[in-house]
């Protein structure tokens, strides 16, 4: 999913705290990488894991997460995930605030 899907986060102050709930599908090639941890350490986000599915013998990982932090930090984190070719789907119940 492209970053413009999350453009509503750009329209407010980058220092305003916001939250967004989304679904991630992480490719198998990143199975051993600390991708969710990077969202906390690199982007100073609070991450709430609402659901997760990982295959026991490999495969992709699927997560439902709530990200809480400054709008700019969330956008930067989403750009990082897109660089990794993680599939991002915004939860339609989430309004980003």
Curated annotation (Swiss-Prot):
Gene3D superfamilies: 3.30.70.260. This is Uncharacterized protein ssr2439. Coiled coil: none annotated. Transmembrane segments: none annotated. Signal peptide: none annotated. May have a regulatory function. InterPro entries: ACT-like_dom_sf, NIL_domain.
């Amino acid at each position: 999913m492209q970053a413009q899907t999350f453009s509503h986060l750009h329209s407010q102050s980058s220092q305003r705290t916001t939250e967004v709930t989304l679904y991630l599908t992480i490719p198998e090639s990143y199975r051993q990488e600390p991708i969710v941890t990077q969202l906390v350490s690199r982007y100073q986000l609070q991450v709430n894991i609402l659901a997760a599915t990982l295959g026991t013998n490999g495969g992709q990982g699927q997560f439902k997460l709530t990200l809480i932090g400054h709008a700019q930090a969330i956008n930067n984190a989403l750009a990082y995930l897109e660089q990794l070719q993680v599939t991002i789907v915004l939860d339609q119940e989430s309004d980003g605030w």
